[in-house]
Amino acid sequence: MRLPVTLYPGEDGFIVAECPVIPGCISQGRTEEEALANIKEAIELCLEVRKEAGLPLTLPLHEIEVAI
């Protein structure tokens, strides 16, 4: 399964990793590699919990660009 992940700067120099198609699935790391490893683990746990709860594994992602 391939899922989108967003990386962005967090507090204290951490990199935040978030999977936008799984509500609340977020992690962080001191490096991009650590953040990606941590979000992979978080995704596995989130999918397991959603499956056990009978929830859809992922939600649709609708990306749009906004001009400002």
Roles of regions detected by a PLM:
Residues 1-4, 37-68:
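Short, charged, surface-exposed hinge/linker loops at domain edges
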Residues 8-22:
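Short aromatic-glycine-(Arg/Gly/Cys) micro-motifs in beta-strand/loop hairpins
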Residues 23-32:
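A short, exposed loop/beta-hairpin motif centered on an aromatic-Gly-Thr core
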